[in-house]
């Protein structure tokens, strides 16, 4: 607004010395934008909110719906009824992309197009700072991780089918048989999202089981290879791609990305990595970099909310710089225009953080992880439990609930002895009974602890038409019940301290509840001494525990 001419005229109203001082302040803010547009990477130091809002408002004024004299007579003219909605979106209502390309420029929305391109560039630079090197252009999509995986798999299949179509005449018979390329080899990770992403793409999921090594679940490379080479189901030509994962719930470790990437290169099949919240871990970023340097990785999908501290709704696809074909295909596969909201959230956050702030967040998360591991280990041992050893997982950790389960079994035996008059009661509290180990998660949640997961062996669940045994553990028969916690981006030492304090109370309260449940159960069965017996048992619990 304040052009040199306007500033000169302003000197007729306010002292020139004051106007000069004010113009220096506005010029400094203008230089922030000049540097951003010239360097096209994260600013060294984060911007203040006023500078960010000023930039967004000016960008919005470059869109046709904010032109002073614009007359829109089309079916889509970015009309917004509510002033509140307009302010929420800074007047940016055209969205991004065009029908043929989600990253294409819009003639009526120069400002929105500029913001979208800058977001992709800043996200790519944030990846670089986090340790993801040799990456091609990043593509921010207004879809959460699961739907982005579905879109990526659809694009992957189209590339695969196009490649099979180029087979020479001597191979045409086998190519025709396998051209559908509908099989997705998936390294098991018990989250419904992954299964539904494959089903949503109309593809066939082939589950490669995990392998238990110590406490940790790792990639069964032999199972992955066998699934790819299965000639009874078409062999490699029938495979759309392999889907591996980096970030996951303990005791599941990150997949052996380098080995899987080498296998995919050797067998000439695609490879998509689910890196949902892996950007926040430097070690996982380094692992992805190593994988696409040494083998085949077609694309990597990651969430915006988990990695950049923004609301749910966006994800980022990136391919290696030497082969960005999959990202290009997804960009051109997206139907119609897209919402700018997830891109705008990421842009605002990254401008606010700057490179220094982003590094500080990454450092703080790693510190929180080590602190949580030490505190959880001590808390677990104080209650007869132990921290699961999962060195291949740099974000999540697990704690056994074995001692708690043994306590419940002891309480059950005592109740059964009263009820039956003998010592044959050995009811398991894993999956039912008066108080179940699985209730421990509800007890934590009721104490305002969110994010923990209690996994009890033996659960069978069907997801997307596939039956999973031991669902939740990513293994058919994980040997112990456990709960998980994660030191994700934004977690502080204060969070960890509060969590461990509430965890200690939950352990004590859970055992008290189990004793009360046993007392009520026995009383309902007509045992007149049940109440006193349960109270005596509670008093002596510390001596008989474990």
PLM-predicted stretches and their roles:
Residues 24-29, 43, 47-51, 256, ...:
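Secondary-structure junction/capping motif
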Residues 14, 118, 122-131, 138-377, ...:
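Conserved PLP-enzyme active-site core in the AAT-like
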Residues 39-54, 270, 299-308, 339-351, ...:
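Short, charge-rich amphipathic segments
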Residues 93-101, 208-211, 486-488:
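Short loop/turn segments at strand-loop or loop-helix junctions that form parts
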Residues 105-109, 137-142, 243-245, 400, ...:
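Short glycine-rich or small-residue beta-strand-to-loop segments that form or flank ligand, phosphate
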Residues 3-150, 154-159, 365:
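Conserved N-terminal alpha-helix of the aminotransferase class I/II PLP-enzyme fold
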Residues 3-4, 11, 18-21, 26-35, ...:
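Conserved C-terminal alpha-helix-loop-beta "cap" of PLP-dependent enzymes
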Residues 71-80, 104-111, 182-188, 283, ...:
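Short, mixed-charge, low-aromatic patches
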């Amino acid at each position: 607004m304040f052009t040199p001419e306007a500033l000169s005229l302003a000197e007729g109203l306010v002292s020139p010395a004051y106007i000069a001082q004010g113009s220096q302040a506005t010029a400094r803010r203008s230089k922030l934008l000049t540097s951003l547009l010239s360097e096209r990477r994260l600013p060294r130091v984060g911007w203040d909110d006023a500078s960010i809002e000023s930039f967004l408002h000016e960008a919005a004024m470059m869109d046709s719906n904010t032109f002073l004299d614009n007359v829109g007579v089309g079916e889509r003219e970015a009309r917004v009824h509510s002033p509140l909605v307009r302010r929420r979106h800074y007047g940016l209502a055209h969205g991004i992309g065009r029908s043929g390309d989600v990253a294409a420029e819009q003639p009526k929305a120069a400002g929105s197009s500029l913001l979208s391109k800058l977001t992709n560039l800043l996200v790519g630079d944030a990846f670089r700072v986090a340790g993801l090197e040799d990456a091609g252009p990043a593509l921010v999509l207004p879809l959460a991780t699961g739907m982005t995986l579905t879109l990526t798999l659809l694009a992957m299949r189209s590339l695969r089918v196009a490649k099979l179509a180029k087979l020479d005449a001597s191979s045409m018979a086998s190519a025709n048989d396998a051209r559908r390329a509908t099989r997705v080899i998936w390294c098991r990770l018990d989250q419904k999202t992954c299964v539904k992403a494959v089903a949503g793409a109309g593809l066939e999921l082939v589950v490669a089981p995990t392998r238990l090594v110590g406490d940790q679940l790792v990639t069964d490379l032999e199972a992955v290879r066998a699934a790819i080479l299965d000639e009874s189901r078409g062999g490699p030509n029938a495979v759309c791609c392999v889907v591996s994962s980096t970030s996951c719930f303990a005791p599941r470790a990150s997949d052996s990305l380098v080995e899987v990437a080498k296998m995919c290169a050797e067998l000439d099949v695609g490879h998509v990595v689910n890196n949902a919240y892996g950007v926040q871990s430097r070690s996982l970023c380094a692992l992805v970099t190593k994988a696409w340097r040494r083998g085949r990785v077609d694309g990597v999908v990651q969430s915006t909310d988990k990695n950049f501290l923004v609301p749910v709704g966006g994800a980022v696809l990136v391919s290696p710089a030497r082969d960005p074909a999959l990202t290009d295909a997804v960009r051109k596969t997206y139907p119609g225009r897209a919402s700018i909201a997830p891109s705008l959230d990421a842009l605002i956050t990254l401008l606010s953080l700057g490179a220094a702030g982003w590094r500080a967040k990454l450092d703080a998360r790693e510190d929180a992880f080590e602190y949580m591991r030490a505190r959880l280990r001590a808390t677990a041992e104080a209650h007869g439990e132990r921290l699961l050893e999962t060195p291949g997982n740099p974000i999540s950790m697990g704690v056994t609930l074995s001692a708690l389960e043994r306590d419940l079994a002891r309480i059950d035996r005592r109740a059964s002895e009263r009820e039956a008059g003998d010592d044959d009661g050995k009811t398991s509290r894993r999956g039912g009974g008066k108080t179940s180990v699985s209730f421990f998660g509800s007890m934590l949640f009721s104490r305002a602890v969110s994010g923990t997961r209690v996994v009890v062996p033996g659960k069978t669940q069907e997801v997307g038409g596939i039956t999973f045994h031991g669902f939740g553990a990513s293994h058919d028969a994980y040997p112990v019940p456990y709960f998980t916690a994660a030191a994700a981006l934004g977690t502080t030492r204060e969070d960890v301290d509060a969590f461990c304090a509430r965890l200690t109370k939950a352990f004590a309260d859970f055992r008290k509840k189990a004793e009360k449940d046993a007392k009520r159960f026995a009383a309902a069965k007509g045992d007149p001494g049940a109440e006193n017996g349960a109270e005596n048992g509670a008093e002596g619990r510390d001596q008989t525990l474990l």
